[in-house]
Amino acid sequence: MPLDKTIKKVLIIGSGPNNIGQAAEFDYSGTQACKAVKEEGIETVLVNSNPATIMTDSHIADKVYIEPLTEEAVEKIIEKERPDGILAGFGGQTALNLAMNLNDAGVLDKYNVRLLGINSEAIKKAEDREEFKNLMEEIDEPVPKSIIATHIDECIDFVNKFGLPVIIRPAFTLGGTGGGIASTMEELKEICDRGIKMSPIGQILLEQSVAGWKELEYEVMRDAKDNCIIVCNMENLDPVGVHTGDSIVTAPSQTLTDKEYHMLRHSALKIIRNLKIEGGCNIQFALNPKSNDYIVIEVNPRVSRSSALASKAAGYPIAKIAAKIAVGYSLDELKNYVTKNSSACFEPALDYVVVKIPKWPFDKFNTAERHLGTQMKATGEVMAIDRDFESALLKAVTSLEGKISGLRLEKFEYTTVRELLEKIKKQDDERIFAIAEAFRRGVDVKQIHEVTEIDNWYLNGINRIIDMEKELQDKNNKDKDKSIIKAKKMGFTVAEIARITSLEEGKIKNILNVNNVKPVFKMVDTCSGEFEAETPYYYSSYENEDENEVTDDKKIVVIGSGPIRIGQGIEFDYCCVHGVWAIKEAGYKSIIINNNPETVSTDFDTADKLYFESLYIDNVMNIIEKEKPEGVIVQFGGQTAINLADKLYKNGVKILGTSFESIDLAEDREKFSELLKELNIPQAKGMAVTSMEEAYEAVKEIGYPVIVRPSYVIGGRAMQVVYDKLALQKYMTEAVTLSTEHPVLIDKYIKGTEIEVDTISDGENILIPGIMEHIERTGVHSGDSITMYPYHTLPKEVVDKLVKYTKSLAKALEVKGLMNIQYVYDGENVYVIEVNPRASRTVPILSKVTGVPMVKLAVEILTGKNLKELGYGVDLKKDNKLYAVKVPVFSNEKLANVDIYLGPEMRSTGEVMGIDSDFEVAIYKGFRAAGIEVPKDGGNLYVSIKDVDKQESVPIIKKYTEFGYKIYASLGTGKFLQKQGIDCEVLRTDDLMKAIGDGKINLIINSPTRGNTVGTRGFSIRRKAAEYKVGAFTCIDTAKAFLTAIKVKREEAKVEYRAMKEYFK
């Protein structure tokens, strides 16, 4: 079937902000979908609330709406645009749920809009747990014994009949939110209660647990002619019981027999045919390893996280093909876009092994519950490709970037075998390292299999890695050089081989060089070399044949940003992608190195050449030595890329833009402090300390409160405001490792307005596209603050000072390209908080709201131009006639035992933007886009305010009462408010907890004296609010801003939704 000519205009719904369970993979799939439809001459309209995405760039769709993903907003956009169809399968669960709500409310019928690729009936059959179960039984596909429950009593009856454990899966939720495995009646009641509340339709599936069975996924495509193919099948290393997003995954599956593979393949094709899905679909199975029994776990009737992984693993652009199918094409009419020589009907063939490892946020949250279950906790993932499992696994582990060297965690070296086996029983993020350590201690595969139920094939692979370690350590080894070569080919890093053998790294490198041990580069071409590929991508391997054609063209390498994590999100992938595009425009060949399967940067057609590799110095240098580029850009890939600057510099690599010396100066506390003194720019009083005694002395001189943090951080990790000696002592012993190499920085905490300045510099002149002001005062991490463009309260003399200081710093640091500076204004002086000589997380939003292509201009400077040639002027650009408000989004409900208070440690996983020509409406849109309900008629508000904020909170609480809120309070706050004439009811903690659980509290304002202290009353209240999705503000500035949103709602102000182009007319 050719293109459907009746489709003239299509609305694509994005996925909104990044959060746990829904991250960059939907920017990748949404961008592909927009491009695929647009190139058919169909008008594309995109709605998405996430300004950090490539898909919200003005050229990706004909019209781009950065507006809240709410029924109200999208209905108004449909009314205005009148699309013929909607693509809802490329924006994750958010888009699917929104499309279903619009369908059920009659909006799609009213405006004669079709759901393309998947109809509402298929969505219901896949997403509604009861309908799904009924369909599977109808087509004779096995599902576990289960019931659909909407009340706790039904759950208890089921367990009384069939026993524990059971798995609880809420309907229409994301990343397993609200679900879990219950092994006791107490757990059953708690998880079921939470799951029913978190499901948008109040429904959960309760099913008999098959924990311990193998978990497998099949990525399937189907068209309207009923052509079906399997793109890729994947196997979770962890058995059923761990969410697939939290599991180590291999592609293709490694342990299935041919019979098992085809049995599940047949089932997957039968399911997609009966659901009548046209496009992509992900089907998850559980397989009993002791028999041929299997069950169908669930179906995602859309492009998913696993689709992104399958796309990159197989080299098959699932989202692009699915979008083409949705507008009428069939698989046999489409080409494979990687080979351009074969049909999209051919199933990809993989002659390599792919390993995905999740990236968890536990390095930031040391109090978090690390147990992995059916509710996803990972923020991102890495993918590695090699010719065998062992090499791919070691490459993936290296890609995680933490303080990890091979399959080793230092802390396990001091544990007993019994402790290790106890640790291995529990499914958590460290289990694979505990397994490796158990093998080092002589525990055998059989014993570990009994404890973990991980297939012996995988355990044998891990054991072979440990055997290699033992061979390297063997004092009687007569041919150590041979063992070193063997280890390198297996995937060991030079640093790890040096550590194991106690030899210098230089000596190891020499042995490898003398023996000409260098990697070759193999292609991902979807067809195991059967057809010639036009746009393949590459991975390294220690084999003989090199499939990589290196040209003499002038080329530039961009270092990617690695896995999505808190503090380094999709914004940096945005910068890398724009960097690659600008390099092409400047007449160079673009090369990107990255390891994140979720992103646009690792799409097959983004750069001229993609290397899917670990961002470890060994791997990066192998590519640079092979390609011999004109230079390397590190300023777009966040702290990951910046951290490579030192090693690249020492290896003689030319870093384009700001020099390594300047990067180091900005990061080095003492050197930078001296520079500020020379430039006469005020800074908060601070010191670097390397011992407890020095810390006490420093605080004596500076005075409490202080901000403490390690040097070289990302996202404010292990950063805290400290108010007294006890808190300082606790921080120094628990949060950081003190040493002369890693000093701790202690700064005076200055309370004031925080300001963000992003600038482009050519070494002489600067261009500041806009100045952004934070709503929350200092002490809250910039990534967690509500941020306004343009600035709202700053006097002209302060703005002049900001421009002057920024110019001085750019010149002194000889910045070429992008730089971000954070300032604080305390009402009298402007102080520099920090300087980042690189792209920041505000570059995408600032580029969009000012119309200045910041990354493109930076690349033009890096390739020889200056600002005056580029046509955007110099110094501070005049503000556009619009207001933009960036609102952070958190995944608090996903991470048990983590405090939600806002402080200097970044916690948000994503962001949204509210944009309007009216400032108050922009704030309203921002809160709505962040998923926060804005009530018109008040509700029940609980307040508990720390002493220093009490007086300031009075007019704010009074305003809430005027807006119809009944006030409940803690004892201390209640007494204070009553004295101020505010009517309130004091609630004991137990009563409050019950009220939150019963849904009787709508909003909480709780400014903690000391956040992050597990076990306190405030911590318990904040956690309960997170788990039951009750809005909680921990900063009174946020609570004050929310009043503005309520005001807009109460006044029924006319809220208009505009395409971005309308603001630039």
From Swiss-Prot:
It comes from the Bacteria. Its EC number is 6.3.4.16, 6.3.5.5. Mn(2+) 2 binds at E298, N300. Binds 4 Mg(2+) or Mn(2+) ions per subunit. ATP 2 binds at R709, K748, I750, E754, G779, V780, H781, S782, Q822, E834. Residues 1-401 are annotated as: Carboxyphosphate synthetic domain. This is Carbamoyl phosphate synthase large chain.
